[in-house]
Design a protein with these regions (language model features):
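Catalytic-core regions of core metabolic enzymes
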Residues: 1-290
Length: 290
């Protein structure tokens, strides 16, 4: 078992023939990901990267049984692409696009929830189940197969955490980059819950940042559900000034509970093994697993 994606997943790329879609689809295919085709309206019937191109997601679902989609489209079109995927019956939608208008994203989010699909992102690096499926923009070589699940708001810190876990002789079950926008489809708590229910995941690394309540909500849920698996946590943005975004649109300290200090306090109170530097993640994981 893994979560969200594996070697059986049938993946399509929305924005397949564009420069971003082409570049990352090439990397995904080279990794061994089961990319079954892509969607670019007006180019249906062509082939690209030796895969079929479809005009619509519905055609892709009908003809190649696609069940997972990754979206590489400009912000103005991405929310519609999410809703098109859901309407066509896609179960897991991974949205890389940054800067989708909040109003568009609110509609798409409500649509996804109403239909029971799973949305990862937007503004995320994607999801990787090592040695099975890389559905995103992450460097695949950093990830080795194992029993540690990673959930992170940050792309680069996902790669850093994986590199450290692997350097300890351990590996990753699945890594989920949930995204750094204010409105995202899968929260920290949602992702942690997936790992808690995954028999192959024995430890969870939870990486958050200033702004919002996602990490506190996840920590309280972990405690309420009985701390079934060890969780190692890190919060980025310790030195961020109040009222300034730090890299991500959602990374902004509004109230006193949004600070790194407050989040880390809540996480510790809930039994999470919190580290103060990303450089300590790997060693802490090895420690709690021993």
């Amino acid at each position: 078992m893994s979560v969200l994606v594996n070697k059986e997943s049938k993946i399509i790329v929305q924005g397949f023939t564009g420069s971003e879609g082409t570049f990352h689809a090439t990397q995904m295919i080279a990794y061994g990901t089961n990319v079954v085709g892509g969607v670019t309206p007006g180019k249906g019937g062509q082939t690209h990267l030796e895969k079929p191109v479809f005009n619509t997601v519905a055609e892709a679902v009908d003809q190649v049984d696609a069940d997972t989609s990754i979206i590489f489209l400009p912000p103005a079109f991405a929310a519609d692409a999410i809703m098109e995927s859901v309407e066509a019956g896609i179960k897991v939608i991974i949205t890389i696009t940054e800067g989708i208008p909040v109003n568009d994203m609110t509609k798409a989010f409500q649509y996804v929830k109403a239909k029971g699909a799973t949305l990862i992102g937007p503004n995320c690096p994607g999801v990787i189940t090592p040695e099975e499926a890389k559905v995103g923009i992450m460097p695949g070589f950093v990830f080795k197969k194992g029993k540690v699940g990673i959930v992170s708001k940050s792309g680069t810190l996902t790669y850093e955490a994986s590199d450290q876990v692997v350097s300890q002789g351990l590996g990753i079950s699945t890594a989920i980059g949930i995204g750094g926008d204010p409105i995202i489809g899968t929260t920290t708590k949602d992702a942690v819950e997936l790992f808690m229910n995954d028999p192959e995941t024995e430890c969870i690394v939870m990486i958050g940042e200033i702004g919002g309540q996602l990490e506190a909500d996840a920590a309280k849920w972990i405690k309420a559900s009985g701390n079934k698996k060890p969780v190692v946590g890190f919060i980025a943005g310790e030195t961020a000034p109040k009222g300034r975004t730090m890299g991500h649109a959602g990374a902004i300290v509004g109230g006193s509970e949004d600070t790194a200090e407050a989040k880390k306090r809540i996480m510790r109170e809930c039994g999470i093994h919190v580290v103060d530097s990303p450089a300590q993640i790997g060693a802490k994981v090895a420690e709690v697993l021993s």
